[in-house]
């Protein structure tokens, strides 16, 4: 039943080529010997939409305070958010077992980077002799959150994932998550 979560190509490779695409009733036929392998043509009716938006930016400011001291501030952001909506209609193997199955998942991640460095360079007695000192601080923060909702046992396939409440499930699957990681360090 869950082989529909693999791939169309996997089903096509393992499906019995002697079985017709549809049976006498007009439903997608299943192999009598490989009933757990979905009809690969039926998988073309699965609706799966993914949208991802990403912002990636970096920048820095550098200043020279004295002839020998440079300070640099480096900042960056990586913001990634996505939404995936899927619907397995009743014409598919797993969709038939579930009475149609819809899922919506959304995730968002924001990574922030902050680095501050100070570089001191002093020419000593001879041209080849010099003193270099680098000190710095680095801070990185990752924030993420997500949510998911689904339903099954729909009386029609027309709604796709747009009316999860139309499913007839006592406890539809709902999930959410949120978290944060931080990392800070001094170096020199």
Regions found by a protein language model. Give the residues of each.
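Surface-exposed loop/interface segments of Gram-negative outer-membrane beta-barrel transport/assembly proteins
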Residues: 1-54, 74-185
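A conserved hydrophobic secondary-structure block that centers on an alpha-helix together
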Residues: 62-77
